[in-house]
Every structure is written in C-alpha cells, then in structure tokens.
Amino acid sequence: WKFLALLGYAAIYTYLAPWHLPSNRWYTWVIAILGVDLLFYVYHRTAHRVRLIWATHQAHHSSQYFNFATALRQKWNNSGEILVWIPLPLLGIPPWMVFLSFSINLVYQFWIHTEHIGKLWRPIEFVFNTPSHHRVHHGMDQEYLDRNYGGIRPLRARLFGPPRAPTPRPDTGTIRTAEP
C-alpha cells in the first residue's frame, strides 16, 4: 500500500501542487516534519474517536505495560492513515520527504514508550512530547482519557485540548475495546 500511496503522492505533487519546495532547503524539512506531526495529531485524535479506526489502533493501547514493546504494537493496515498526508504533496513537499518525515515521527515516538525516563527538564517537556506526556496518553484512569495525542510536539495538545501531567503515574491499558 505504501508504494501505491507514493505513486499517488507523486501524481498529486507533479500535477496538482501549485509549486515545488526545494528538498535541499532547511525550511522544507521544517515544514515537512511539522506538517507530518500536525497531521499525525489529527489522525491520532480521529483514531481514538472513530470506531472503525479505533479497532485497528486499540491493540497499541491494550498493554498494561508501558514499554518499548508497546511502541511496537502497530496496526497491520493503514486504516486510511495515508490519506491524512495528502495536503503535504499538495503544498509542494516532495513525496519521498513526506514518507521520510513520517518515519522520523514514528522513530521519535518509539523512545517515548518507557517507564525508565521520568520528567525531563521543563523546556524539553514544553517543546517535545516526552515519556511523561505519552504515559498520560496511554493512561486508562478517567482523568487521563483522551489526552496528549501529539507525536513529536505536545503543542497541539496545548492548543486543541489540555495536556495532563501524570500525577500520580497512570495505570496503562485500555478500558474499552472496539468502542472509542
């Protein structure tokens, strides 16, 4: 499916994008990475609210342990996720950069699935999604549900819904199955 998506993105980029941003410029990378991160937030929030998408995402949240193995619990299909990034080639981001930016986003999110890192220095906690933010996202306690959907940056959580600090540490897992 990724190859087909790459072909689709290439067609959108080639025939529909009003301009093409240069891949050798730093600002294109910033736009690509932040764009993927914003659209990841949109998709991730949707995945928690739309029953069909939650059915593919719930395995990631079902572990009662918050560790690197939890990070590897990924869906086998894209459940429409690939459609979320269509605006990026339309904005002139080269398709290969969209995929690489998504890979960077996913690799970043791997390390935040751990209990071994506590709260970090306050400026880091403010700018980046950290294990303490993501612990809240995986929490099954009522006060932690539906929080902190960000990938790399928690800014979207600050803008679109209040972030929560884990006090005390939340129990992880899921309280629901196919119901979002």
Spans of model-derived segments:
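Membrane-embedded catalytic scaffold of the fatty acid hydroxylase/desaturase
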Residues: W1-K2, P22-R176
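Juxtamembrane/interfacial segments at transmembrane-helix boundaries in multi-pass membrane proteins
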Residues: L6-V30
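Charged, amphipathic alpha-helical linkers/stalks
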Residues: E179-P180
